[in-house]
Amino acid sequence: MKLLHFTILLQVSLFPASSLAQAGGNNTEVQVQQTLPGTGIAAVNSVNLLRIYSQDTSGGIREARFEGYWSGGLANDTIAKARANSSIAAASDDLELYKSSSSTNFLLKIRVYYLLPNNTLGEAASDSQSRWYTGSLNQYNFQVASHSRLAAVFVPSTQRPRLRIYAQLGDNTIQEFGYDVSPLSQLEPMFANYLKVGRGWQRLANFGPALPGTGIAALTYTTGLRRSTTRVYFQTTDRRVVERVYDNRSWSDGGTVVRTAKPRTPLAATSFLLTPGNPQSVRVYYGTEDNRILEKGTEGGTYWYDGAFEHSAIPDSQVAAVDWGNGGVFNIRLYIQDGAFKNGISEWAWFRRSWRRGILAIPPA
């Protein structure tokens, strides 16, 4: 189920005049102070939809939205309640066209993951643009480390989608959790909840020990008919950022991506295809001791080089990344806390072959 992407004409709308110069003011600053410093940040997109998830000071997971303009991010945009200082991960399936007898609606399937107060995994789910419900993951009481970060992906499939979550256990190993969705479970939630469909959530691969509190990033992409590749990134006890690769058959060691990163570095990753038939390009974002966010890149995974992105962030800032584009045009979006309105989440964009600031701070700013 290949992710749909923006075209260059739609990309331009990400830079309206109001996004490039954002006025402050007491109301804006008060609203932004409700965003937790060092909040987990997660981002998903499809076609012209973008969603950003962060945590407020009361533990709520809030959703900010971009659909040609920014909205959301307020208290009434809370989709779940998490443990304080919870990591946040999100995954989205393709944009789908749903037709009812009375209307036609565009739906984006989204899953958002977080830690509950007892350090078990929680899930908020949406199969439309407005309706959220508690996902089935909450029933499994999967215990993870109190310092665990999270990553999540919808694995592309021509038959049915598969969900994967990556977390750190109490013994500091990195664990994969998975859910293979049956066709029946793709019905509207009101029907799916009454049907026992799919194989349920399961523990899958374990990648061994990692640095306690490491960031975790994951991405996935199609590599051919009914085949996909998943890549997972985390930090080892010697502070290297390493890669694990699943080639639709088994996991392998992808080697070292970053030789030395900030302990418990934030991590984000995204991928894109510059030219059909060429290897997939991958970008990984990580933190340094002096609180900069840097970029590593590879084309096909043969070697890693230093990317162009470099920007300072607040000491505990996390990072999220998405890509909109293909066929020679790619437009990466990064989300970090870089001090805008103190706690605001800022957007940085690779657009027309250079990095530039997108919106100074996403809603509630």
UniProtKB/Swiss-Prot annotation:
The keyword Glycoprotein appears for this protein: yes
Stored Pfam families: Fungal_lectin
Binding site for beta-L-fucose 5: R283
Any one of the GO CC terms: extracellular region
Annotated spans, 6 X approximate tandem repeats: 22-365
Sequence repeats: 22-79, 80-141, 142-206, 207-261, 262-309, 310-365
Chain sites annotated for binding beta-L-fucose 3: R164, E176
Annotated keywords: Glycoprotein, Lectin, Repeat, Secreted, Signal
Binding annotation for beta-L-fucose 4: R231
Binding-site residues, beta-L-fucose 1: R51, E63, W132
Broad class of the protein's primary localization: secreted
Subcellular location(s) of the protein: Secreted
Protein's job: Probable L-fucose-binding lectin.
Comment text on domains: Adopts the six-bladed beta-propeller fold and contains six binding sites per monomer, each located between two adjacent blades. The six binding sites that are non-equivalent, and owing to minor differences in amino-acid composition they exhibit a marked difference in specific ligand recognition.
Subunit details: Homodimer.
Protein name as annotated: Fucose-specific lectin
Organism: Arthroderma benhamiae (strain ATCC MYA-4681 / CBS 112371) (Trichophyton mentagrophytes)
Origin organism lineage: Eukaryota, Fungi, Dikarya, Ascomycota, Pezizomycotina
